[in-house]
Amino acid sequence: MAEEILGNIAEEAHAALLASAGDEATKKSGAIRLPIEDSLDGDFGSRGTAYTDLSTTTSAGTSGQLVERTGGISFGRLLSVAGSCSINLLLPFLNGLMLGFGELLAHELSWKFSWFDKERNRGYRIYPEVRKAAELQERERQRALSRAAGPDGFL
């Protein structure tokens, strides 16, 4: 195990030297270099990670993968900006919607199940029109019952 690690150190140093020498050449030519694995199963052999210069790629299968930097905004950069804008602008909007609907739902449930005493809690007077009409009808019904009951409270 130790021999393999020590043997790989020399190979890694050699690969780093080749990569730095290749980086200077790509800076001058303007081409982009990408790492390519030697095999799909991850066995890299004695060469480590190989680099290929995309400006010298001539095969028909890889010519479509030629990536060159041009003036303007790249599609990846545009997606990155759109993603950060959606996080900063869209998610707070959705959060506000969820909070608002949650508050409306809690209010409706408390009204439906009479969780709070309506006689004691008179400070909160914001109701939809339908509920205002229902409350007025309930008051009229209570007044009619109290008038019919008489002064002593019995029928």
Curated annotation (Swiss-Prot):
GO terms for biological process: mitochondrial outer membrane translocase complex assembly; protein insertion into mitochondrial outer membrane. One of its GO terms (cellular component) is mitochondrial outer membrane. Its main location: mitochondrion. Keywords: Membrane, Mitochondrion, Mitochondrion outer membrane, Protein transport, Transport. It is found in: Mitochondrion outer membrane. It comes from the Eukaryota. Pfam families: TOM13. PANTHER family: MITOCHONDRIAL IMPORT PROTEIN 1. Required for the assembly of the TOM (translocase of outer membrane) receptor complex, which is responsible for the recognition and translocation of cytosolically synthesized mitochondrial preproteins. Belongs to the MIM1 family. This is Mitochondrial import protein 1. The lineage of its organism: Eukaryota, Fungi, Dikarya, Ascomycota, Saccharomycotina.
